[in-house]
């Protein structure tokens, strides 16, 4: 299933326009013919920003090419610029909205989206993640090799992974005899990168985590990454301890330390609001989908099982957490939201692949402790 879910589906750009961009980025048709045996005209994936195609190099390497769609940068610049101006006007006209800081949020989104347009930054993110894997001695996880000599701001040529998404139960069983161990590998790799790498993968939805044919976990699509400031770590550690013990007051006080408060925060009231949100988290369940597949040659019907992780529900829950903080007079760091959203994804994967696993108490799970090391935290 390779890169099929690395991007959200949108209307693809005609291949003639895609190959024209490839030729321009590589210096002409002669260079393209020199480097590539073929490029599949049919897109593997298409999103608002980029389109992905299978290809094979003259060396025999199977690759994918990620091409920025024409006109995307100008459209995004204009739309996000207008949105920023509108948010500033809204804050001026309604000062009570200043606590939410719409303009700051829009500015962060604008920066992140424009960063995604420059594939050189994504290539750099992949390189740094690969270096982290080497330093940490992690052999069971991998990121795709980037072909730098063939890549540019608008073109990214990467190793092609063959595997299945982390939510494809039947597919995982074909590549791994122990899905729970595979999940732990993915979780450990990601959580260690939060502390030990220069940045962490900030978009770990199932399409970006693959179980490869050799059983390794493949991380793809590094367009969005996050970084946690050192001064936030102590608060995160207390937040984790509060979560483990269902101590909502400790969770509330740690969030107060982490965020910028308008004034005195009522810890007890804040803790009550957090408890309501945590009850919603406990009620969220991943849905199992079973589908029939007909073999065209034999006519035999087989059934496959996968998990449907409601990304919209995860986003809504994250917004509820941020909203509760803001209603209690807090502005949480942007990185906190990015981190929590990834943790919510892993919570869903755990409920499906390893329902008996408690990541916060299981000694097989490695958690960052905030001082540059990783170990068991308050278990």
Predicted feature locations:
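Catalytic-loop of the protein kinase fold
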Residues: 199-206
